[in-house]
UniProtKB/Swiss-Prot annotation:
Tissue-wise expression: Expressed by the venom duct.
Domain comment quoted from the record: The cysteine framework is IX (C-C-C-C-C-C).
Signal sequence segment: 1-23
Keywords: Cleavage on pair of basic residues, Disulfide bond, Ion channel impairing toxin, Neurotoxin, Secreted, Signal, Toxin
Function recorded in the entry: Probable neurotoxin that inhibits ion channels.
The name this protein goes by in its record: Conotoxin Lt9a
Lineage, highest ranks first: Eukaryota, Metazoa, Spiralia, Lophotrochozoa, Mollusca
Residue ranges annotated as propeptide in the record: 24-40
Coiled coil: none
Top-rank taxon: Eukaryota
Organism of origin: Conus litteratus (Lettered cone)
Any single GO CC term annotated in Swiss-Prot or TrEMBL for this entry: extracellular region
Similarity comment: family membership: Belongs to the conotoxin P superfamily.
Length: 73
């Protein structure tokens, strides 16, 4: 494929994606919110799972289960 044809193909694909994003703003926003929520839950699990506990107060905001802090999702 020549350089000109490649450039035209890339331009067409970019314009098609731009039109899709304009037509579907709710879908794009909803997906971003889900991803953000998922990342915060993973950080919470990692933070809680690395700690040991003897009482529930040791794990705030997590819970103490069998001597380990956990966060049930």
């Amino acid at each position: 494929m020549t350089l000109t044809k490649s450039a035209v193909l890339i331009l067409v694909l970019l314009l098609a994606f731009d039109n899709f994003a304009d037509v579907q703003p709710g879908l794009i926003t909803m997906g971003g919110g889900r991803l953000s929520n998922l990342l915060s839950k993973r950080v919470s699990i990692w933070f809680c799972a690395s700690r040991t506990c003897s009482t529930p107060a040791d794990c705030n905001p997590c819970t103490c289960e069998s001597g380990v802090c956990v966060d049930w999702l």
